[in-house]
């Protein structure tokens, strides 16, 4: 798989750009702040419908405009597929697949399969659980695009249930007992969609675990052994496959956990149980990586998580596109060499670098130089001829 064309309109610092890309390695070179990462961000957005840098879409739209457009043409096994994504201010985002409108932007997920390495990856080890949940969900969505709808529905139900919890004090004051019947309805919906999301995550962690261990050993052969696990906000012992029985069991356990925390939830007005409270546990030896890993160990583990994702996607069928956003500058010589070796088999590798010296020696790559120019609305990124 490779991206043949990337077009941007009013995306971040890019007013207008059309890039013809090729299989193999391409390096986008330019000083920091010139818009290199914005190209990688656009491709990652096309992969997951989300940015790796911000949680909202608004910052992706160029200042002074009301919409951004990302256009890609992806070649997979000789077949071309065109995707256009429109990110709008105050409106629902839109998508087109092969120039035809689709019902939901989620319908284009899976066209581009990519793995992203970025400086923000250190947050997978040292950051909050939300960073690790997003890593799992993004990978699950790339592998099984239907998970995007599962997560979206869970988040919708979670918002509704949270709003209902916050309304309970007022309902009690008015003597309205119907709110508790409504809460039970939302409990059932939360359990249904939450169980499906948890089952997908557990299955993914089980497949990732041996790959993370192998990748970490490659990157840090003298360090402790790496391991990962899934920590849920409820009892999940037992299920390991994504069968209907497992999802039903998880839903029952989630309902039981909601009932057990009901008083605390009503008191605090928040949902205390569910996949939005879960975490991916990372360990080095018998210690948690967060708080105990050195800087080098943390980087090795973060890269190992991405390499494990890359390996799973390869096993699924087809080489995913590798997106390396200024990551070589963050790694020492040994880890840089290990990542470069892993990337050798990829059909397409797209890299950003502030200076060419950040690229591993001996890499044969096309170079695209990025600059900035001023216009009436400020500065904008451009590709040098």
UniProtKB/Swiss-Prot annotation:
Coiled coil: none annotated. Keywords: ATP-binding, Cytoplasm, DNA damage, DNA repair, DNA replication, DNA-binding, Nucleotide-binding, SOS response. It holds the Pfam family SMC_N. One of its GO terms (molecular function) is ATP binding. ATP binds at residues 30-37. Its main location: cytoplasm. InterPro entries: DNA-binding_RecF, DNA-binding_RecF_CS, P-loop_NTPase, RecF/RecN/SMC_N, RecF_2. It is found in: Cytoplasm. GO terms for cellular component: cytoplasm. GO terms for biological process: DNA replication; DNA synthesis involved in DNA repair; double-strand break repair; SOS response. The RecF protein is involved in DNA metabolism; it is required for DNA replication and normal SOS inducibility. RecF binds preferentially to single-stranded, linear DNA. It also seems to bind ATP. Belongs to the RecF family. HAMAP family: RecF. This is DNA replication and repair protein RecF. It comes from Mycobacterium tuberculosis (strain CDC 1551 / Oshkosh). The gene is recF.
């Amino acid at each position: 798989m490779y991206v043949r064309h990337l077009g941007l309109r009013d995306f971040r610092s890019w007013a207008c750009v059309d890039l013809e890309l090729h299989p193999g390695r391409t390096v986008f070179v330019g000083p920091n702040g010139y818009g290199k990462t914005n190209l990688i961000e656009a491709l990652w957005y096309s992969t997951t419908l989300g940015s790796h840098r911000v949680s909202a879409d608004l910052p992706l739209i160029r200042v002074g405009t009301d919409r951004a457009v990302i256009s890609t043409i992806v070649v997979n096994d000789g077949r071309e597929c065109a995707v256009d994504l429109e990110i709008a201010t105050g409106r629902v985002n839109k998508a087109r697949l092969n120039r035809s409108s689709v019902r939901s932007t989620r319908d284009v997920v899976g066209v581009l399969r990519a793995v992203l390495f970025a400086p923000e990856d250190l947050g997978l080890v040292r950051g909050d659980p939300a960073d690790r949940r997003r890593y799992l969900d993004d990978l699950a969505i790339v592998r099984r695009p239907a998970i995007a709808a599962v997560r979206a529905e869970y988040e919708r139900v979670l918002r509704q249930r949270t709003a209902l919890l916050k309304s309970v004090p007022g309902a009690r004051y008015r003597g309205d007992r119907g709110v508790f019947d409504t809460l039970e309805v939302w409990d059932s919906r939360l359990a249904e969609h939450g169980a499906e999301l948890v089952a997908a995550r557990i299955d993914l962690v089980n497949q990732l675990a041996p790959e993370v261990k192998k990748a970490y050993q490659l990157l840090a052969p003298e360090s402790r052994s790496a391991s990962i696990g899934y920590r849920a906000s409820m009892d999940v012992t037992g299920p390991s496959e994504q069968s209907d029985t497992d999802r039903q069991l998880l839903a029952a356990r989630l309902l039981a956990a909601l009932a057990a925390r009901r008083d605390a939830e009503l008191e605090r007005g928040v949902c205390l149980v569910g996949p939005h409270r879960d975490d991916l546990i990372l360990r080095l030896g018998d210690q948690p990586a967060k708080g105990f890993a050195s800087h080098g160990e943390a980087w090795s583990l973060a890269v190992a998580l991405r390499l494990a994702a890359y390996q799973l996607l390869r096993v699924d069928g087809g080489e995913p596109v590798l997106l390396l956003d200024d990551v070589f500058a963050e790694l020492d010589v040994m880890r840089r060499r290990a990542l470069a070796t892993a990337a050798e088999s990829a059909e397409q590798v797209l890299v950003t670098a502030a200076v060419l010296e950040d690229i591993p020696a001996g890499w044969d790559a096309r170079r695209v130089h990025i600059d900035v120019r001023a216009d009436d609305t400020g500065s904008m990124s451009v590709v040098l001829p």
